[in-house]
Amino acid sequence: MHVIKRDGRQERVMFDKITSRIQKLCYGLNMDFVDPAQITMKVIQGLYSGVTTVELDTLAAETAATLTTKHPDYAILAARIAVSNLHKEAKKVFSDVMEDLYNYINPHNGKHSPMVAKSTLDIVLANKDRLNSAIIYDRDFSYNYFGFKTLERSYLLKINGKVAERPQHMLMRVSVGIHKEDIDAAIETYNLLSERWFTHASPTLFNAGTNRPQLSSCFLLSMKDDSIEGIYDTLKQCALISKSAGGIGVAVSCIRATGSYIAGTNGNSNGLVPMLRVYNNTARYVDQGGNKRPGAFAIYLEPWHLDIFEFLDLKKNTGKEEQRARDLFFALWIPDLFMKRVETNQDWSLMCPNECPGLDEVWGEEFEKLYASYEKQGRVRKVVKAQQLWYAIIESQTETGTPYMLYKDSCNRKSNQQNLGTIKCSSLCTEIVEYTSKDEVAVCNLASLALNMYVTSEHTYDFKKLAEVTKVVVRNLNKIIDINYYPVPEACLSNKRHRPIGIGVQGLADAFILMRYPFESAEAQLLNKQIFETIYYGALEASCDLAKEQGPYETYEGSPVSKGILQYDMWNVTPTDLWDWKLLKEKIAKYGIRNSLLIAPMPTASTAQILGNNESIEPYTSNIYTRRVLSGEFQIVNPHLLKDLTERGLWHEEMKNQIIACNGSIQSIPEIPDDLKQLYKTVWEISQKTVLKMAAERGAFIDQSQSLNIHIAEPNYGKLTSMHFYGWKQGLKTGMYYLRTRPAANPIQFTLNKEKLKDKEKVSKEEEEKERNTAAMVCSLENRDECLMCGS
């Protein structure tokens, strides 16, 4: 059997040669556990004559990855094999790689199709010695196997299907793409990115330094007008943004309801559903640049709209196709008045915005006055019990995990953009809360701080370093506003006037574990607050420094910050004594700030996978999960737990099987000591009341909002109602992003006879269940405290 080498020569397969290649990459690993010969044995079994050395390395890396559950060092080895494989394939020198990317000729049409911008290449070539020598290729070896594979699959630029960039090249391309001729700043950013202190968002990593640097993640729109022109102009904007791979939030509360009169045609409106089906098909058609994921639109509606019940059915799995729009995402923009009426079991009036205009343009007391005046004038189209609509909301969430829940009055009352007008919606991921109008499409550029990195070897938390890195991130995101490619002019106008940015986090759960704090402990709750105080403080200080150089953002005057009111003031919260807020407020009073909004913990799915961190602000969902690779799928264990169990001599095949049998929980495994059981509780074992409380405590330092998922293993209407009311009363802006549930571990098997139940019996069962659910919902509203105690 022979292999084909990289230069095309053939060579006989030699067991020892494969083993020695693997052995070379085992430096610093625990050789009591890691066995290169065992990997070689498995690799040989998968070989065929004529295999290339590239394929051989890929197989060796996958094989090492599958052995990760034996010892965590196998994961490091797997990544080293994969990275060294790429290093042999891709050129080393950064400036050479950038020239190759610029000189790319498209094989389909023979035309010059540069993959990086001429301006980027010129800067690289003019500073090539400094940039080339600043790169430290060993840092490529710090990715874990799955982080590296994610980069290779989606982030590193390819020439004719072959990866051309090394991870360090990509990070330097991004740094130069953002900072242009400011080489000192580019190298500072490169070092922080490559040492994993923070990461820019995926669109920034994909597109920085290219011909079309669309670096923003989020776009928010409100309907231009309740007319055919307005609806289709907005649709075109959505299509153009989606083509550039932006996630979209759209406010549709101003669109007239079903049956409303249309003066221009003397006809009647078909309402929201047919319009949203058109938006649904656009989302499917415009799939973020031709070969990526489908377009993603979140549709925001206020619950007084007459079409609200149909809106709640749009994502359901059953029902008539023409009444569904399953590719869209749905969110409620909820005024406090609705929550109050649900709580006190009052009536709720449904209206058409054409007959009752302006409800989406006001909030708080003004909204309540206008709404009550329309009720008095009898302009109402339908009256229902507020709890009947609440039941439909809970029913939809239990079935589909959505609609998202955002509280309109909190979003406006606690916004630094409230001087611009009423905010009408959030983003696709519920963390961006920005003003939109017919002339302005709100935009946000994102980055996330890797919170695990600031835990020192002495188990203390380095707040000073966190503040320093936050300041660099602010400067970067502020620069992106000016160099960004905007898919529509309204986005450019909005972003340059208000200059909002969104700094989020990843690895909060990892930071708690490294500090040895269980997620629900008092220590974790204090650290949670202090982390977000630090990020908010650092961000405000950096934005103030920028304002000192460049002046405050255009619409600063009249904003809460311009009056000395910061986010925590709007929550009536006093910060801890970690930072000198008095000094900062004096500085801001003198110079202002450059950015209207700063903090927005977003979901960090892809970038957290790259850096090997747990997502965002979330607890771990499981201590074991499955990963798929070409050669099959295998289990990965929470690396912190694996390390702890290995150190205590508790890690063996039987333990792995027990964790798998317990669906990733360790609570019922007798050999595991209590301190580890506390530390490694999964989200299903953590009180969601604590999760909501911690969200509110950090919320006082979050001037946008946060993507907050609620996890209830087996939701019932009572538990869910309790959760929502607790979150609302805590003052959250986003009460819920997704409702995450767990499929029953042993689904009940229906026998044929049971399926043949008479329809009558089935109907009575459904009615019984509805009564039970309603009772649970009402019970939780009437006995809030007791119900929360019995809820998760």
UniProtKB/Swiss-Prot annotation:
Keywords: Acetylation, Allosteric enzyme, ATP-binding, Cytoplasm, Deoxyribonucleotide synthesis, Disulfide bond, Nucleotide-binding, Oxidoreductase, Phosphoprotein
Binding site for GDP: 202, 217, 431, 604-607
Site location (Important for hydrogen atom transfer): 218, 444
GO-annotated cellular components: ribonucleoside-diphosphate reductase complex
Residues annotated as domain ATP-cone: 1-92
Chain positions with Phosphothreonine modification: 751
Record site: Interacts with thioredoxin/glutaredoxin: 787, 790
Protein name: Ribonucleoside-diphosphate reductase large subunit
